């Protein structure tokens, strides 16, 4: 049974929320906790165990930032093709 985009988003969102426990103690030298908005580190909220830490010193998002905002900002500079490719990667990995 094919999942729709809303269900996929909810799965990603839930996984992202669950991942916070793994990384909540990471702080930069100035004490700020960061998450990245890049594909390489953020992995669309999919954690590949501890190795896929969500951190990036150049990010302006805190871990309390709204997921939808982070997702929208992350993909806004990508082409429709790239966003579709990411969506397919998520579907292939999860469903």
PLM feature spans:
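Acidic, low-complexity, intrinsically disordered interaction modules
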Residues: 17-85
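Negatively charged, low-complexity tracts enriched in Asp/Glu with abundant Ser/Thr
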Residues: 1-30, 91-94
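Short, aromatic- and cysteine-enriched interfacial helices/patches
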Residues: 54, 94-95
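Acidic, proline/glycine-rich low-complexity IDRs
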Residues: 83, 87-93
């Amino acid at each position: 049974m094919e999942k729709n985009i809303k269900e996929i988003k909810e799965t990603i969102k839930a996984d992202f929320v669950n991942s916070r426990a793994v990384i909540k103690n990471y702080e930069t030298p100035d004490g700020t906790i960061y998450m990245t908005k890049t594909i390489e580190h953020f992995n669309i909220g999919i954690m590949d165990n501890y190795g896929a830490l969500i951190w990036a010193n150049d990010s302006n998002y805190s871990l309390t930032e709204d997921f939808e905002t982070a997702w929208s900002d992350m993909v806004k500079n990508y082409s429709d093709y790239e966003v579709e490719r990411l969506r397919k990667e998520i579907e292939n990995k999860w469903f």
